[in-house]
Amino acid sequence: MEFSPPLQRATLIQRYKRFLADVITPDGRELTLHCPNTGAMTGCATRGDTVWYSTSDNTKRKYPHTWELTQSQSGAFICVNTLWANRLTKEAILNESISELSGYSSLKSEVKYGAERSRIDFMLQADSRPDCYIEVKSVTLAENEQGYFPDAVTERGQKHLRELMNVAAEGQRAVIFFAVLHSAITRFSPARHIDEKYAQLLSEAQQRGVEILAYKAEISAEGMALKKSLSVTL
């Protein structure tokens, strides 16, 4: 996936009110960007980081500029727009770049399922195969080269794991897919030090037949694509 039109560069001043960030452009203008990320964004929003942003042609938007990527002062690229996790995963499935999810004839998005009335990110279907339910999570928290999810306690994420366990128990295929959107990450684990309950549920889910996949994106200011399978340690 290529960014079109090309992203523009600025330097981060501050992120605030969760959804806003002030930046300064190379020519000295100060802009307020929309920040499409409600998470803690630990390590993704340090003053002085390079920000790559897009600009909407919708003249009715109060904040027409959207923060897409951070380029940290150590050089790592991080996708902070959480919408891209699903877009990149869908693209990779359709391109059959994820071998574990290839061979299906139908892909549906946002399908209602489960006792808790969740919406699964993707459902794959094919003749003579069980339906495949896929929940996607965006991974941007890094400590050295170790990637973690979540970056804050997530009751919603816990609910999704319970739903996936029920799917697996019914004989369907259940997959939790971690889209790693930080170029410095080389391996993945649940963030037990942040959300112990989530880590426990992830281990339980694997024991009950839920598949755990982690794929890393190649990221630059020109574009992104999920390319490489990473090892997962529970």
From Swiss-Prot:
Tell me the DNA-binding residue spans.
201-220
Q: One matching Pfam family, short form?
A: SfsA_N
Q: Per its UniProt entry, which superkingdom is the organism in? A: Bacteria
Signal peptide positions are none
Keywords (A to Z) from UniProt: DNA-binding
Q: Which InterPro entries match?
A: SfsA (IPR005224), SfsA_C (IPR040452), SfsA_N (IPR041465)
Q: Name one GO molecular function term.
A: DNA binding
Function, please?
Binds to DNA non-specifically. Could be a regulatory factor involved in maltose metabolism.
Q: Which family does it belong to?
A: Belongs to the SfsA family.
Q: What's the name of the protein? A: Sugar fermentation stimulation protein A
Organism from which the protein derives: Shigella sonnei (strain Ss046)
